[in-house]
Amino acid sequence: MRTSSRMENQASLSSIQRAVWDGKLPLQITLASSESRTYDQTDPYLIACPRISYLPSLLPRLRAFFSSSLIEPNSQPHEGWFSFEGVPLKWHLPVGLLYDLYAGADPASKGTRIDETDHPSSSLSDTLPWRLTVHFSDWPDEELVRLDADGMVMHDAFINSVKEADFLRNGTAKGIMTLSKEDSAGLWQAVQDVDLPSFQRISNILLPPPNQPFRNIPIRFFLPLSPDSGSPSLKVVQSPLPPSIPVATNTSQSTNLRNSPATQVQTLGSALHSLLPNLFPSRRTPVLAKPVLHGAAVPMSAPIEELVRSCAYGDGWAYIVIRMMG
């Protein structure tokens, strides 16, 4: 029975992962008016963009689409960058995370679709399609690292993030460091192509098997700050989080179990309570804030290892946005 239950759980996690990779966001991208021959009369570029993808992958087709409108005809695709309401967007963060951070409507805790392009609710009507601006000049050097024509800056940033996740999962980055050059390039290409089977073939080399727990969980929490806070617009919280934690016991029980302490599964609620107790005073119920991943509110009872196995972005990280309630 235990084997059957484990197989059912694996099938469920695989189904969730497929839904995550199928998730898309409708984007409406406009050329910066200061770079357009027709100011604000240029037609926008519309696309259903995979949530797990990265904005720079759109630059070649955007450069071609807006070529006849550009004041500067010699600009190159890798010189492009994106902004939302005047804020430069970090190109190393996945599209879905950027949307959840800057524009995501209040998510429903039940019945939320990962693919927001299908029948968006009225709460999403004001934020979808997500309206972005693309620029091919005036790179914001103080906020963004420049890209290169060969795409190696983007590739290296992705692989470095994969290395960090690999180290946390296994206690060593040996897996990614010994990955062949072909598989390393293939992992990044699979994310660019949104090719889940090819991605799984390579990523499964790095993941501990289902019956072997992670050493620590690669998960980051993003807390948007108000513009007048005097701090960067985003605060990232990260700490080593094991997949299991000691069970709270009384003194006598603790003495009896000293040599073999009982453990329980680390849930998202227990992790948030330990890292952000002021925002999450309860381990079980969101009171002041809610965790959002891939556009959906995540149950506090979700085991964080299962969450990462099924819902991580292509670099192996679960990026969770903390959204205030009320």
From Swiss-Prot:
Signal peptide residue numbers: none
Membrane-protein topology: Peripheral membrane protein
InterPro entries: Atg5, ATG5_HBR, Atg5_HR, ATG5_UblA, Atg5_UblA_dom_sf, ATG5_UblB
Any one GO CC term of the record: phagophore assembly site membrane
Positions of disulphide bridges: none
Matches recorded under Gene3D superfamilies: 3.10.20.620, Autophagy protein Apg5, helix rich domain, Phosphatidylinositol 3-kinase Catalytic Subunit, Chain A, domain 1
Gene Ontology molecular function terms on file: Atg8-family ligase activity
Superkingdom field: Eukaryota
UniProt keyword Membrane, yes or no: yes
Pfam families: ATG5_HBR, ATG5_UblA, ATG5_UblB
Subcellular compartments: Preautophagosomal structure membrane
Cross-link (Glycyl lysine isopeptide (Lys-Gly) (interchain with G-Cter in atg12)), chain numbering: 163
Alphabetic keyword roster: Autophagy, Isopeptide bond, Membrane, Protein transport, Transport, Ubl conjugation
GO terms under biological process: autophagy of mitochondrion; cellular response to nitrogen starvation; piecemeal microautophagy of the nucleus; protein transport
Modifications made to the protein after synthesis: Conjugated to atg12; which is essential for autophagy.
Family: Belongs to the ATG5 family.
Assembly and binders: Conjugated with atg12.
Function in brief: Involved in cytoplasm to vacuole transport (Cvt) and autophagic vesicle formation. Autophagy is essential for maintenance of amino acid levels and protein synthesis under nitrogen starvation. Required for selective autophagic degradation of the nucleus (nucleophagy). Also required for mitophagy, which eliminates defective or superfluous mitochondria in order to fulfill cellular energy requirements and prevent excess ROS production.
Name assigned to this protein: Autophagy protein 5
